[in-house]
Amino acid sequence: MLAGLAGGRVGWALDAAQDPSLLEQRQAVLAALAQALNGGTVKRFRLAEALAGSDPEAIDDALGLWLSWLRDVLLVVEGCPERIVNRDQQAEIEAAARQLDSRDLQAAIRAVQAARAQVASAINTRMALEVLMLRLPPVTSPARPDPARPAR
């Protein structure tokens, strides 16, 4: 499973096999994304503030993981669940896929990519992250019906 979660980063997979705290950090980053998607504006801005206090490399890593997770949700929405990378998050990914559509996910992916580029170019990190938080779609709306399940 670590090889898949590493996303081609052999060094990370080897490090994670030796240091379980890397997996805990990964879970914390994904929990932050869940907070952003499920939270209101105030919660999102607090998260942006906390994330902005990290070093640029940590922010880039976090946003990269967010991209990977959002990509997996998009794959499920588009009917390709077998291609997801974050298999340890499959239940969460499927739940998000029932609440978001392809357009929302593509917009979220573009917003994360833009924030990542802005952080890399030393633009005001906190402002870039706040804009990202405003652009993420909410997943607190009622779940869409699962297309694989027949209607009752």
Label each residue range with its predicted role:
Residues 1-65, 69-85, 89-152:
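Charged, glycine-rich active-site and insertion segments that engage polyanionic ligands
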